[in-house]
Amino acid sequence: MAALPDRDKLLRNFTRCANWEEKYLYIIELGQRLPVLSEEAHNPENIIQGCQSQVWIVMRQNDDGVIELQGDSDAAIVKGLVAVVFILYHQMSAQDIVAFDIRPWFEQMALTQHLTPSRSQGLEAMIRAIRSKAANIS
């Protein structure tokens, strides 16, 4: 399984896509790169409310204080959006996640303008859930 790119490479790769069909395919590919989430983690405690598709996100803090995120979705494009969010929050502490404004990255990628309203709402629900969990850890 190929590793996920860092933030800058994500943005570069995204801007290299010729059109939105290519960008959607790239997002789906990123979702396919996510490590498999265990069956035990597919439980109501980890489900994200407010997403039309089913989304599970598991968050834990490692010994260095860095937040580790794992996730899954039953929809390919949404799983890719989970991967995008994880890339943007990669190697951050709980405090960093709470303080980090992720939306300018979405604007640079022109992502929110090209998502359906329900996917945009789901993306916001993911961000709120991650930030809320991070605030409880910090």
Curated annotation (Swiss-Prot):
Record keyword Cytoplasm present: yes
A GO cellular component annotation in the UniProt record: cytoplasm
One annotated GO biological process: sulfur compound metabolic process
Functional pathway: Cofactor biosynthesis; iron-sulfur cluster biosynthesis
Principal place of residence: cytoplasm
Any coiled-coil regions, as ranges: none
Location of the active site: C51
InterPro entries: Cysteine_desulfuration_SufE, Fe-S_metab-assoc_dom
HAMAP family: SufE
Known role: Participates in cysteine desulfuration mediated by SufS. Cysteine desulfuration mobilizes sulfur from L-cysteine to yield L-alanine and constitutes an essential step in sulfur metabolism for biosynthesis of a variety of sulfur-containing biomolecules. Functions as a sulfur acceptor for SufS, by mediating the direct transfer of the sulfur atom from the S-sulfanylcysteine of SufS, an intermediate product of cysteine desulfuration process.
Family the UniProt entry places it in: Belongs to the SufE family.
Protein name: Cysteine desulfuration protein SufE
Organism: Enterobacter sp. (strain 638)
